[in-house]
């Protein structure tokens, strides 16, 4: 009888776990979004709104919800919009004219619009880039020569009469006056 008991125990041990049939899972197919990435929607909204001081987050949100299928999850839409605005400002694709973070007003950066047009030109003429850099270097050398020429007349003017020394000071004063309005216009543009 002990032999029978031994024979039964191996029978119990033999049913080991078979490989799972679930191991061959069907990969989940991701459904394509019904809308483009949020940063693209934001730039499209800002460019179409054409507000002088820039577009607010609320105006951008209204435009996006009216023109794209986003669903009913308002909290997700707001969080995605906020993150898109912050990333756009960080990557310099957007310029924040007023406010901080996701509040305030936003404009599309002028550089991004210019760079979007330039890549087609750059692809066609890659050899011209090298020539342009060479031209820039020669221009820099010429400006150095002009500075040297400007210094030599000043040395000649010093031994001259006192009237000659007064005239350069008059020239300096108008340059400062001209520089101040330029700063004001730069501040007004920004």
UniProtKB/Swiss-Prot annotation:
GO terms for cellular component: nucleosome; nucleus. Its main location: nucleus. Residues 1-29, 141-190 are annotated as: Disordered. It is found in: Nucleus; Chromosome. One of its GO terms (biological process) is chromosome condensation. Residues 148-183 have a biased composition (Basic residues). Keywords: Acetylation, Chromosome, DNA-binding, Nucleus. One of its GO terms (molecular function) is double-stranded DNA binding. Residues 34-110 form the H15 domain. The modification N-acetylserine is found at residue 2. Residues 9-29 have a biased composition (Low complexity). It comes from the Eukaryota. Belongs to the histone H1/H5 family. Histones H1 are necessary for the condensation of nucleosome chains into higher-order structures. This is Putative histone H1.6. The lineage of its organism: Eukaryota, Metazoa, Ecdysozoa, Nematoda, Chromadorea.
């Amino acid at each position: 009888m002990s032999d029978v008991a031994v024979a039964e125990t191996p029978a119990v041990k033999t049913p080991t776990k078979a490989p799972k049939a679930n191991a061959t899972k069907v990969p989940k197919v991701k459904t394509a979004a019904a809308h483009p990435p949020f940063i693209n929607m934001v730039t499209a909204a800002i460019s179409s709104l054409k507000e002088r001081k820039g577009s607010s987050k609320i105006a951008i949100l209204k435009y996006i919800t009216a023109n794209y299928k986003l669903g009913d999850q308002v909290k997700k839409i707001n969080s995605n919009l906020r993150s898109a605005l912050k990333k756009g400002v960080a990557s310099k694709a957007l310029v924040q004219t007023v406010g901080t973070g996701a509040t305030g007003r936003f404009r599309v950066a002028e550089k991004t619009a210019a760079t979007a047009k330039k890549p087609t030109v750059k692809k066609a003429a890659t050899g011209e880039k090298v020539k342009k850099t060479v031209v820039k270097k020669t221009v820099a050398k010429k400006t150095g020569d002009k500075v040297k020429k400007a210094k030599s007349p000043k040395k000649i003017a010093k031994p001259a009469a006192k009237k000659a020394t007064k005239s350069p000071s008059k020239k300096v004063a108008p340059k400062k006056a001209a520089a101040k309005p330029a700063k004001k216009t730069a501040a007004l543009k920004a």
